[in-house]
UniProtKB/Swiss-Prot annotation:
CDD domains: Thr-synth_2. The modification N6-(pyridoxal phosphate)lysine is found at residue 113. It comes from the Eukaryota. One of its GO terms (molecular function) is lyase activity. This is Threonine synthase-like 2. Gene3D superfamilies: 3.40.50.1100, Threonine synthase, N-terminal domain. One of its GO terms (cellular component) is extracellular space. The gene is THNSL2. Its cofactor is pyridoxal 5'-phosphate. The keyword Chloroplast does not apply.
Length: 484
């Protein structure tokens, strides 16, 4: 299968090329040139698969056995999920009043990003060992991506990872999960800015195509196609767990509620919908509501500033995966997508063309949820079920409660739960509840930390480039010594 840039200028690449890229050289994001179509028979066959089984089928569909033979692919995916705490890897909790919560947080760092990052890192290691190459991974994080990326890469002999975290804008636990990893190939920077601000030096570095090529740079943020590919399995598993039957014509709809920051899970869900999965998508955001405004009014524009909320991993103003959604909505029209995104980058504001907005609002519903509603939802879920939600999961569950309180017709619904409440004791306390903290999270408090500060006024881009150049020098020296 071939992958093309949403902006249509960069040459097409195979899965390996997309895997090792951040942004495409023309500033776009890689997408499959053609989407396969799944028929009813395939969906029925897949309906009995485990979550890892679905990941295997989806990856085989989008990678191609000539690049990665099926048995080797299956081994890599088994290895990726070997350290998850739940035997199902992903678990559905069926609670009162039709509330279905899909727990995506049974990995090492208690967040959904463990799922896609553990697989992506296995794919990277496979190709790096085959090609005898080294890469430097650069990640900007609002909280969970950084720790999951570090966990999946730490100690890998062919990879270094640089993580930029927003100092004071993620929770103490999230920060400790990153700064307590002291492996030689892990390099953490604490940035005096928010997650959108720290994305700027990263985007600038990736825009220098010669620099990226020279130093084998890549990203593990959800701009990486492999992340989106694995996340498609969330939607298939949600559907098969919640659909009442596969015997009806047409197949029944299931509503999937997606707590959304950078929109990787939304892009994955929309692709799943496009290839034949009968789901209705609901985007649930906090007060950083750019996607909600885009769905409701076609207004894809920045607010004055990022608002700090209890659902801190979603405190994002620039949901870069919307570019993938726009490209799909436009019928893979790279000219339309490029014009939209270049205008947004220039002016921070775009009004979607009428036809595009109409297609978006047909495909996706949206809701924006305040901190007060988050804590009320956490409290209600505990009162009704003795079940603790993280604040991000509560954003999704709030939509479910709105629907049942209005006595809306009951389509089966699944709320994606991206993180464990254990990672957000501050939010649990704000909801008037008692945090439950696992021993391995408590232990973080007593570990040594390592983090380099990027202060306001420092040249963040230069600091990042210098670090990358140092790592390249060290790798070249190591490779030379090994060959001698």
């Amino acid at each position: 299968m071939w992958y093309v840039s949403t902006r249509g200028v960069a040459p097409r690449v195979n899965f390996e090329g997309a895997l090792f890229s951040g942004y495409a050289p023309d500033g776009g994001l890689f997408m499959p040139e053609e989407l396969p179509q799944l028929d009813r028979g395939t969906l029925c066959q897949w309906s009995t698969l485990s979550y890892p089984g679905l990941v295997k089928e989806l990856c085989a569909l989008f990678i191609g056995s000539e690049l990665l033979p099926k048995d080797e692919l299956n081994d890599l995916i088994d290895r990726a999920f070997s350290r998850f705490r739940h035997r199902e890897v992903v678990h559905l909790s069926r609670l009162r009043n039709g509330l279905n919560v899909l727990e995506l947080w049974h990995g090492v760092t208690y967040a959904f990003k463990d799922l896609s990052l553990s697989c992506t890192t296995q794919f990277l290691q496979y190709f790096l060992e085959k090609r005898e190459k080294h890469v430097t991974v650069v990640v900007g994080t609002s909280g969970d991506t950084g720790s999951a990326a570090i966990e999946s890469v730490q100690g890998a002999k062919n990879m270094d990872i640089i993580v930029l975290l927003p100092k004071g804008h993620c929770t103490k636990i999230q920060e400790l999960q990153m700064t307590t990893v002291l492996k030689q190939n892990v390099h953490v920077f604490g940035v005096e800015g928010n997650s959108d601000e720290l994305d700027e030096p990263i985007k600038t570095v990736f825009a220098d195509v010669a620099f990226v090529k020279k130093h084998n740079l890549m990203s593990l943020n959800s701009i990486n196609w492999s992340r989106v590919l694995v996340q498609m399995a969330h939607h298939f598993f949600a559907y098969f767990q919640c659909t009442p039957s596969l015997d009806t014509h047409p197949l029944p709809l299931v509503e999937v509620v997606v707590p959304t920051g950078a929109a990787g899970n939304l892009a994955a869900g929309y692709i799943a919908q496009k290839i034949g999965l009968p789901i209705r998508l609901v985007v649930a955001v906090n007060r950083n509501d750019i996607i909600h405004r885009t769905v409701q009014q076609g207004d894809f524009s920045l607010s004055e500033a990022v608002k700090s909320t209890l659902a801190s991993a979603m405190d994002i103003q620039v949901p870069y995966n919307m570019e993938r959604v726009f490209w799909l909505l436009s019928g893979s029209d790279s000219q339309v997508t490029r014009a939209l995104m270049e205008q947004f980058e220039r002016t921070q504001s775009v009004n979607l063309p009428k036809e595009l907005h109409s297609k978006l609002s047909e495909a996706v519903t949206s809701v924006s949820v305040s901190d007060e509603a988050i804590t009320q939802t956490m409290g209600r879920c505990w009162d009704e079920n003795q079940y603790l939600l993280c604040p991000h999961s509560a954003v999704a569950v709030n939509y479910h409660y709105q629907q049942i309180d209005r006595q809306q017709p009951s389509t089966p619904r699944c709320c994606l739960a991206p993180a464990s409440a254990a990672k957000f004791p501050e939010a649990v306390l704000a909801a008037g509840l008692t945090p439950e903290t696992p021993a391995e999270i408590v232990a973080l408090e007593h570990k040594e930390t390592r983090c380099t500060l990027m202060r306001r006024g420092d040249n963040w881009m230069l600091m990042l480039r210098d670090t990358i150049e140092d790592l390249s020098r060290q790798w070249r020296s190591h490779a030379l010594n090994t060959s001698q």
